[in-house]
Each structure stands twice: as structure tokens, then as C-alpha cells.
């Protein structure tokens, strides 16, 4: 497998010529095992260790390589072990707040093209949970796709009700459905995956991520387990691992997330709740607290059933949790919203979420 097939495009090649020393080679990190990493270059995987400078110079965990990164390295006497000298710049980064620690950030993966939010439509779905995933993904400048699994366990009417709940919350996202049991939707997913692109699977334990990986690989690479009657999943994936698929795409399987604490997510909040940002632009006063002020568009939209109260409460909760306390100025909101102030409240929820050119500048 050539490096281009692993996702090394012209953007990364420019940084290779700039940052890698003569005699060094390039590889992609496919897994992290405690104090050493597993990297892939060509058809083989081998271990690599970090040079000491990483531990002296890295100010935060973000500076260390993670799954999906491209690195410059040199080999030791054995071709099965190498030392990592440099981490190439990233196109994007997927991260979350470490559960139980207010300021620590956990790095999940880098250089992801599409993040699949995997939810079981039998017992795992909740709009607020979906919004949390979207905030994290949008903050990383990654395209989100919702993947409903276990559709064989619910009726078509129940599935449609879930989709309606998503639309009622003002969420616009590509939705795919499948059943690992019947095979429905698997061909659609396979056709969606593109060669040289990198995808990841995010979701709780027990939603079928490992089973799906085995389906896409055509072999039982990952162990799978059953789910309890309460819907509580069991961890089968214990580490993040980037796997090349037969059709040429790369897929990162993630351990199940029981809790999803978001890190500081300014962009992620703005993009995931842009309907609320658009309504704030319509308030009579720029410093409106959205409580009892006259001319408050937020209060009016809630009273007129144009804004889902749970959607708004989740926005406030995530905003507070992430440490996103700095309010945008009215002028900044104007620039962010652009044409949003011209949107009637009834149309706010139907406005499709897109990444702006500014957001795509990493």
C-alpha cells in the first residue's frame, strides 16, 4: 500500500519536504500503545517511539502524535522499530474533555474526513447526546454523518419519529440507516466510503461499531459482545485503531464513550447551534439575556413553538460546560451570521449547516 493510499495528499507532501530531514521516512500513526506507537508505511506496521524532545518541548497533550497523524521518523537497525522526530501539521483534530478533569483534554484522532456518529435506534438515541457529538465534531472542522444501527429492532414508524425529532431540534445532518443483522444499508455505506479518505466511528458501547467494522473488513477482526437487556453496552474496542479497508478507505474504530464531556468548543457551538445564534441576532438589544427583556427573539421563538426548549437548554448547558463564557460582540455575530439576521424565525431551523471558508482554514 502506497502512502497516497493511506491519505498522504499534496497538502501533507508539502510539509514532508519542509519538515522531514534527509534520510527520514514518512509513516501514519495507526494506534497508540501506552508509551509507544504503531505506525504504517506501505504494507507493513511497526512500532515507533518518541524522541526525548517531545517530552521536554510539548506543552500540552495536543503536541503528541495521535491516531491519524503523519510523522517523520528514522529506522533503527531493525526495520520493525523506529524513532519519531516530527509530527506533521494536522488538517483537523478530534478531541474531548477528559472525563473527571476540568482542564485536561483527551486527543482522539487527527486528519479525519468524516466522523460517523453511531447510534442504536433501539435504545441509544437522544437528541441532546447527538448535539454533544456534533459540537465536538464541528469544533474539529470534520464532516458529521449520523449512522443509525439495529434498524431491525424498531418499526419504520419509530425510526421516522427519531428523524423527525432531529429535524425539530434544528439539526441538519446526513442520516444513514443499517442493520448488521439483516445487512440492510451496508451496501449504501460501502458506496459512501471513498478511497484515500479517513473516517471514524464515534458512539457508546454496544451500538454495533465493532460488528460494523468486521462487516466492512469482510473478516472478524474485532471481538464483539452482546448488549444487556437495559441497553448498556460492553467495551469490545479497547484502543483507537486506524484500519485500511479493502475498498481503499481508512476507518478508525473508537472505544465506546459512556460520557461525552466537551472541551472548549467555540466554533463547534456556533455551528451546531447556528439557529439559536441567528435568533440572538434578532433581539432588540445586543446585550439581551434572553429572560424578560422586550423584543427578545429567543423568548418569542420558544413561546411560538419555533424553538425547541430542550434544544435551547442543551445549548446553554454545553456552552457553560465547555468554558465558552466569552460572549460574541454584536458585530461579531453579524459577521458570523451574515444573512442569518434576515431569516424569519420559522425558517431558522431549516437553514442547512455549512462550514464557511473561514472555518476551513486550519
Predicted regions and their residues:
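Catalytic P-loop NTPase motifs of RecA-like helicase/translocase cores
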Residues: 125, 154-155, 184, 258-261
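Helix-rich effector regions associated with P-loop NTPase G domains
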Residues: 23, 59, 63-70, 74-77, ...
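A conserved segment at the C-terminal end of the G1
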Residues: 209-225
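Phosphate-binding glycine-rich loops and their immediate beta-loop-alpha structural context
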Residues: 108-172
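Signal for well-folded cores of large energy- and translation-related assemblies
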Residues: 17, 120, 134-138, 152, ...
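N-terminal accessory targeting/assembly segments
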Residues: 1-127, 359-362
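Canonical P-loop GTPase G-domain recognition
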Residues: 143, 152-207
Amino acid at each position: 500500500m502506497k502512502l497516497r493510499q493511506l491519505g498522504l495528499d499534496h497538502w501533507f507532501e508539502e510539509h514532508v519536504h519542509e519538515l522531514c530531514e534527509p534520510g527520514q521516512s514518512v509513516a501514519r500513526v495507526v494506534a497508540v500503545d501506552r508509551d509507544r506507537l504503531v505506525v504504517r508505511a506501505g504494507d507493513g506496521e511497526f512500532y515507533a517511539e518518541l524522541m526525548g524532545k517531545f517530552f521536554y518541548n510539548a506543552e500540552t497533550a495536543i503536541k503528541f502524535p495521535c491516531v491519524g497523524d503523519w510523522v517523520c521518523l528514522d529506522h533503527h537497525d531493525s526495520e520493525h522499530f523506529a524513532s519519531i522526530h516530527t509530527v506533521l501539521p494536522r488538517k483537523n483534530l478530534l478531541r474531548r474533555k477528559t472525563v473527571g478533569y476540568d482542564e485536561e483534554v483527551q486527543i482522539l484522532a487527527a486528519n479525519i474526513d468524516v466522523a460517523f456518529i453511531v447510534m442504536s435506534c433501539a435504545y441509544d438515541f437522544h437528541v441532546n447526546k447527538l448535539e454533544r457529538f456534533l459540537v465536538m465534531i464541528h469544533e474539529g472542522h470534520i464532516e458529521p454523518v449520523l449512522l443509525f444501527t439495529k434498524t431491525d429492532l424498531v418499526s419504520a414508524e419509530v425510526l421516522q419519529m427519531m428523524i423527525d425529532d432531529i429535524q425539530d431540534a434544528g439539526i441538519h445532518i446526513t442520516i444513514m440507516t443499517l442493520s448488521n443483522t439483516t445487512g440492510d444499508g451496508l451496501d449504501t455505506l460501502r458506496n459512501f466510503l471513498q478511497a484515500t479518505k479517513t473516517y471514524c466511528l464515534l458512539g457508546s458501547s454496544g451500538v454495533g461499531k465493532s460488528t460494523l467494522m468486521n462487516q466492512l473488513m469482510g473478516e472478524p477482526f474485532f471481538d464483539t459482545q452482546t448488549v444487556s437487556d437495559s441497553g448498556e453496552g460492553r467495551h469490545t474496542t479497547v484502543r483507537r485503531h486506524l484500519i485500511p479497508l479493502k475498498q481503499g478507505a481508512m476507518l478508525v474504530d473508537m472505544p465506546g464513550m459512556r460520557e461525552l464531556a466537551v472541551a472548549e468548543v467555540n466554533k463547534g457551538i456556533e455551528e451546531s447551534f447556528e439557529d439559536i445564534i441567528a435568533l440572538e441576532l434578532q433581539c432588540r438589544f445586543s446585550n439581551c439575556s434572553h429572560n424578560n427583556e422586550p423584543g427578545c427573539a429567543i423568548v418569542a421563538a420558544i413561546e411560538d413553538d419555533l424553538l425547541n426548549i430542550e434544544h435551547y437548554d442543551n445549548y446553554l448547558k454545553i456552552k457553560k460546560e465547555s468554558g465558552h463564557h466569552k460572549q460574541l460582540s454584536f458585530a461579531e455575530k453579524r459577521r458570523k451570521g451574515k444573512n442569518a439576521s434576515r431569516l424569519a424565525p420559522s425558517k431558522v431551523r431549516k437553514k442547512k449547516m455549512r462550514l464557511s471558508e473561514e472555518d476551513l482554514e486550519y
